[in-house]
Amino acid sequence: MRAEQNILHQLIGRFAGKRMLAVGDLMLDEFVWGRVSRISPEAPVPVVNVTSETYYPGGAANVARNLREFTPDTALMGLAGADRAGRRLVELLETAGIRTEGVLQEDGASTIVKTRVIARHQQVVRVDRERKVALTTEQLARACGYLERAVEGVDGIVVADYGKGFLTQPLADEICRLARKHGKILAVDPHPHTSLVWRGATAIKPNRIEAFSAVGLPPADPVEPVCRDEALLEAARRLRHLWEAESLLVTLGEQGMLLFHGEAEPLHLSAHAQEVFDVSGAGDTAIAVFALGMSAGATPRQAAELANVASGIVVGKLGTATVTPTELRAALAVI
């Protein structure tokens, strides 16, 4: 066990030298913090007295934030509006040291904003402001042109599909083609409603619901032990055939993760979370750390172990959070 932990620590040390690119739907996460002291006389809802507001990059931009915690060479590609929210998002990214030359800012696009109202450490309500707009032919050409220029200078590509319209099958095909051509790690967090095929990716990381949805199977209740969950195993078998990915990592919430790789038996990794305050962004952390691990020379099992521990840390934080190398090392030390 000690030898394996030493290897994991060494892998974390290599993350800083990796060059990573995050691709996907961009959002601005707004958190409105306040106190609740009474119920509204107008409707049976709490009245929140606002004390502060904070903003974070969300969606694929949060994947980039997680990557940036470990490596200074992090870039992002996606679509944002040339509106106030878009300008705020780009400013936050640049302040964090994330390269934004791949962010397409368009006058006709509206930046997606997700507003969460928090009181007493609980989410009271979430308000989404979004308008899905498919990429134009010109925007697709610009995105592909950026990818063509950027891919040779990165070690890994991380795709986060939130189903908001930036990722289309032609763009997915180009990402897969370039990753194969240049021998780059390609890790994908898919969305159940887009039905995009990521054939030949290094790793795909759906959650349980996404795994069933992607192959057209009805969701089934979890089974213990996880490795005997026949419905999940069948969904995974079909996914591996559909996507031809080298590894499939299914995240299962409180059940942890299930890793499929090659001809080996599925590997179940138990969850490590001590307390769960907020699961938003846990998938972003998992795919970012898994991709970093693979880019640093980890085996799929080692990369999954790091991703699993990192996810257990981030769900213990409130808001769109990230994990630092120090936190990950500390968590590994007590496992």
Predicted feature descriptions by range:
Residues R2-L11, P41, V45-V113, A331:
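Substrate-binding N-lobe of the ribokinase-like
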